[in-house]
Amino acid sequence: MTDPAIELLKPFVCGDTLLLADEHWSLEDCIKAKHCITNRFRSALPDSVLFNDFVAPQDEQYSRVVYRLSKERAVVYRCLNLAAEMLSLNGQLVIAGGNKEGIKTALKQAKQLFGPQIETTLHSGYRLAIISKAQAITAIDDNNYTQLRELNVKGQAFWSKPGLFGWDKVDRGSEILVAAIDKQLDGSVLDLGCGWGFLSRAALKQDIDSLTASDNNAAALIATTKNLAPWAHKVTVVADDCGESLAARQFNHIICNPPFHQGFDHQTQLTEKFINQSARLVRRDGTVWWVVNQFVGVSQLAQRAFNQRDHIERRDGFDVWRLSGPKDLAN
C-alpha cells in the first residue's frame, strides 16, 4: 500500500539530506538515503543507516532533514527537536503527513522551533511543508523522550519510555495473555515483539531455561534490557524484525501480542508475517500463545501455517489463541 506522505517526500531524499525514518519507511528507502537515522531495525542495514532511538550523531550538520509524521506525539516532537539540532542555519526541514494524522499541530510546533519561514502545499488530505531554520533553537517539550521512567504495576517496578505503543500503561490484551500462560511454559521461550518486556517478565516467573526477547523498535530494546536485567544470565534481548534473524525450530514456546498497525494503517500483512514467522521458529512439538483484538481473524490467517488452532478465551475484546503443529511454509 502506497503512503501518499512518503511519495511526497521521496524527491527530497537526495544530496546532503538526513532522513529520519520510523516504521513508515521501507528498507529500500532507508538504503537510498545518503544519511539516515531510524528507530526500526531491519536486516542488512548499511553503515549509512544509524539504528537508534532518534539520537543525534556528534558534530554532524545537514542542509536538509526529511521526516514523515509519526503516529505518537512524543516521537513527532522528538524528531522535530532532532531535526532542529541537526540542521545548519538556513537549512530546511521537509515534513509531510495527513490532515487527520496531526500534521497541522506538528507544523505549529515546528514554527515555534524553527521560525516563521514555512511553505505549505496541500495534496488530497495531506500536507507537505518546507521550513527554514531561521533562528537559534529552544527545544519544544517532547515529554523527556530519551528518559526511561518507572511504572508500578501491581507492586512490581517496570521501566518504559515514550516511543513505545502504550508505554505508560499495561496493555489489557497482555494482561489477559499472562493469565492464560500461567504454568504453561518451559524450556526455551521467545517473546516475539516484546515491547517493554511485560510478557517476558511473566514468562521468567515460570520454570523456563532461557528467554529471548526480540523487537525492531529501539525504544523497546532499551526498556526491555532494563526490565530483564536481573535475569541476564538466561535472557537474550535481540534487535530483530519479526524474528527474521533467529534460527528455525529453536523455541518450545512463543508468546506474542502482535501489532496490527504499521504507522497509521491497519496491516493484515503484518499479522500474517508474525504468524508465519512463529510457525518457522517454534519447535514441532511447541506452542505459540497469541493475544489479539477479536476483529483480527487469526483462525483463518493461521490456517496456512498451523495444523492446530485452539481458541482459548475471549475477554474484554481480546482473543487468546494457542497455535501448534507448525507447517513448513514455502518462501
Model-identified regions with their sequence ranges:
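Conserved SAM/SAH cofactor-binding pocket of Class I
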Residues: M1-P46, R172-A247, H253-C256
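Conserved proline-anchored active-site loop of SAM-dependent methyltransferases
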Residues: R64-A74, L192-G197, F251-F264, S278
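A short, conserved alpha-helix within the catalytic core of class I
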Residues: R73-N81, F264-F274
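N-terminal auxiliary segments of SAM/dcSAM-dependent transferases
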Residues: V75-L151
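Short glycine-centered segments of the SAM/dcSAM-binding site in methyltransferase folds
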Residues: G91-Q92, D285-T287
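Short beta->alpha hinge that forms the Motif I/post-I loop of the SAM-binding pocket
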Residues: G98, D215-A220, H266, L270, ...
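SAM-dependent Rossmann-like transferase core, predominantly class I methyltransferases
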Residues: S124-D186
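C-terminal catalytic and target-recognition region of SAM-dependent MTase-like enzymes
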Residues: V288-N331
